[in-house]
Amino acid sequence: YHKQLRAGEWKNNVYKGERLVYRSDRIYGIDISKHQHVKGKKKYGINWSKLRIVHLGNISKKTISGSVNYPISFIYIKSTEGSSILNPYYKKDYAAAKAHGYKVGTYHFFSTLTPANKQASQFLKHSFVRSNDLPPVLDVEPTHEQIKKMGGTGVLFARMRTWLRLVERATGKKPILYISQTFVNRYLSQAPDLKKNYQVWIARYGEYKPDVKMAYWQLCPDGKVAGIQGYVDINVFNGYHDAYSQFVSSH
C-alpha cells in the first residue's frame, strides 16, 4: 500500500496543498453565462477574436511568473438551470466559441427545488454535447439551508446521481461535478461513490491547489478577460499540455 505522496506545503502539521505558480504554459479556461452579457440594464457582446486572460483577480494571493496575458484553451457555457431556466445567450456563445476554435463544454446549474429527471431533460433538450466537446458539467452549489429544506444530503446526493446517470446515458460522456471546497469538506465524504467515480471541477479561491481528484480548478471569480465586459471566472486545468491532450481525447 503506497500512501500518495503529497507535494505541497504543510503548516503546523496541517497539509495546506500545493502552491501553484501561474505561468503562460499552464492550460487556462473560462466559464461564462448570461452574467457576461448583462450588467444592470446594459447588454454587452463578447469580442471573440480578442479573448486573452489579462488578470487573475484580487480575492486571493497568487504567485505569478511573468505578466498575465494568457491564451484561453477551453470555455464552459451555462445552458440551463433547474427545470425551466435557460441562458438566452447559450446557443450564440456556443456557436461563436466553436467557430473561433475553442474547446467547449456546457454546464447545468442544479436546483434543489425540482426533480432531477426534469432537470436532466431540460439540460439534454437545450444543450449541445457533441463528440468533440468537453464533458458536460453539473454545477452544484446549494446552501446548507437549501439542503436541509430538500430533506438533507441523502436526498441531494440521490438527485445528483439521477442527473449524472441520465446525462451520461444520453450523451455517452461521464459528467464532471462542479463543487466548492466547502462542499468537499462538509458533504462529499457522505457520497464515497461520487468522490471515487467522478472528476470534479472545484471552486477554491485560495493560494493552494485543492487536494481532490480534479479536472479543473476555478481559482478566481474576479478575473479579467480582454473582449469580455466585467469579471470572469478563471480556471486552470490540473496538468500540463500532454495531460490535457490526453484528457480531451479520452473524453
Q: Model features per residue range: what roles?
A:
Residues 135-211:
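Catalytic domains of cell-wall/extracellular-matrix polysaccharide-remodeling enzymes
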Residues 14, 55, 79, 98-101, ...:
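Sec/Tat-exported extracytoplasmic proteins
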Residues 17-41, 59-63, 193-251:
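Functionally critical loop-and-helix segments that line ligand-binding/catalytic clefts
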